[in-house]
UniProtKB/Swiss-Prot annotation:
Protein name, as recorded: Iron-sensing transcriptional repressor
Ranges of Polar residues composition bias in the record: 135-148, 240-253, 260-271, 381-407, 450-486
GO process terms (BP): intracellular iron ion homeostasis; negative regulation of ferrichrome biosynthetic process; negative regulation of transcription by RNA polymerase II; positive regulation of transcription by RNA polymerase II
Localization annotation: Nucleus
Record's keyword annotation contains Glycoprotein: no
Record field: compositional bias (Low complexity): 109-120
Species of provenance: Schizosaccharomyces pombe (strain 972 / ATCC 24843)
Function: Transcriptional repressor that binds the consensus promoter sequence 5'-[AT]GATAA-3' during iron-replete conditions to down-regulate transcription of target genes. Represses the expression of the iron transporter fio1 in response to high iron concentrations. Also represses the expression of str1, str2 and str3. Represses the expression of shu1 in presence of iron.
Keywords: DNA-binding, Metal-binding, Nucleus, Phosphoprotein, Repeat, Transcription, Transcription regulation, Zinc, Zinc-finger
Source organism phylogeny: Eukaryota, Fungi, Dikarya, Ascomycota, Taphrinomycotina
GO CC, one annotated term: nucleus
Amino acid sequence: MAAKPAPFGQSCSNCHKTTTSLWRRGPDNSLLCNACGLYQKHRKHARPVKSEDLKDISPLIQQVCKNGTCAGDGFCNGTGGSASCTGCPALNNRIRSLNASKSQSGRKSLSPNPSSVPSSTETKASPTPLESKPQIVSDTTTETSNGTSRRRSSHNQHEDSSPPHEPSVTFCQNCATTNTPLWRRDESGNPICNACGLYYKIHGVHRPVTMKKAIIKRRKRLVFNGNANESQHNLKRMSSGDSGSSVKQQSTRDGPFSKSFPNGNGHASGNSGEGLAEHGMNTGVLPPASTFPSYNSNFTGFLPSSFNPSPLMTLSRLAAGEPDNNGKVYYSYGPTQEQSILPLPENKHEGLPPYQNEYVPNGIRANQVVYPGQLVAVGNDSSKQLSESTTSNTDNNGVATANQSNPLGMKFHLPPILPVGESVCLPPRTSAKPRIAEGIASLLNPEEPPSNSDKQPSMSNGPKSEVSPSQSQQAPLIQSSTSPVSLQFPPEVQGSNVDKRNYALNVLSQLRSQHDLMIQELHNLNQHIQQIDEWLRSSDNENMASEHIKSSTPAVVASGALQT
């Protein structure tokens, strides 16, 4: 006994079952039932089926699926013809309509009054009342509940690949098509196709009949027809629109309401695949970024070759004689382009100019020229002579001229020092103790004169001898005067003089520690500067000596030639 055909023509390609809990896809994109799909997924080959369990496909379904013209590349016409079309909603609807028409013709052939039944040729020639129903309705307009007019198209106005409408066949009440992947309903409850339903949902009006297409763009699937040339041709047809036949097929599918994308000039271009034609999907090369409208072409393509996280490391390397990276040093704490320790070029237009940055790390600007000559260590007497020679060599405009300490006559740029965190030498802040910054500001900037009881005791009396010897040997930061200095303490230490004294000693120790750190950093900088200056002097002397030897050698040879 032959198996009952599926009402929608959906059956497994392996066992031909029409019912399953879940439909799956095989490696060739064919439709499989749940059992065959899981077997194929885990064992990588088809599930064996017994001969008695094998279901036969209806001849009508075999004919439709074999003689169809659909390529299965995402542009569906509901006729079948490829493995991807199995289970397509449009194909299922077509097979159901064919089954309904076949059963209807069978019932007419079994009618007791054969004279009332027209012949097969008359049935094909003359439309039935149900078939001509959309044509009659197309000339009239009906008012909906929203007050908008609905237009219904006739079956003869736009050719449809579906057969004549039957009572069991669902067709769109707006465009009279039976080829759709999803059925929807309008505000009155009538079935409409997916395109008309989405158009009404988005725009609030019914879809014009002129937008009707015979081909539906479905989800793109891979094509496994066994013909590689045909599949490649389909991919090229979708990616490019320059060939003649491809453009014609593209325009046939898209219709008069095809989308157009703006080009670089801001005008709409009908062919959106020109960029992909040159840089297609098959080549794997993306189109250049300049073809996009919103692309900014001001990027010069300059990227730093290396990053140096520490300027002090750069100074030590230069002092050891190592060359820098093409005259440019980059720091990780700022986005600016810094210059190296080498002399600045005479032509300022060569290369990229340094960017101007408002961020001033540690009080030194990024492009500020520092120390035009040799620096002397702090505390030497020669520092005064250097300052006097520098001031004496300044002209009326205030511009310093080259002196003997700078034989090259060029200015050098030193990178700024990385800011040191304030948590290096400071004690942890607690809620009980006031902030150090507030204490320094209150001590150095008194707002109102304190009372006589708030005066700090003299530095030579009483417990002042408890100061450590290291602090007593150092020179005070502020010169002591005959009259005691008036200080204003924060409200947390407005108690006894002992609390004020302890607070003042704490602030003084913090200031001295910061002073020691600054002195040490300046000492290290002076050592590096002296080493660099000595190296530059020695290299300059070597260059001058080599030039002198080259200039004197031809004269000796010439004199020898004259003597001979």
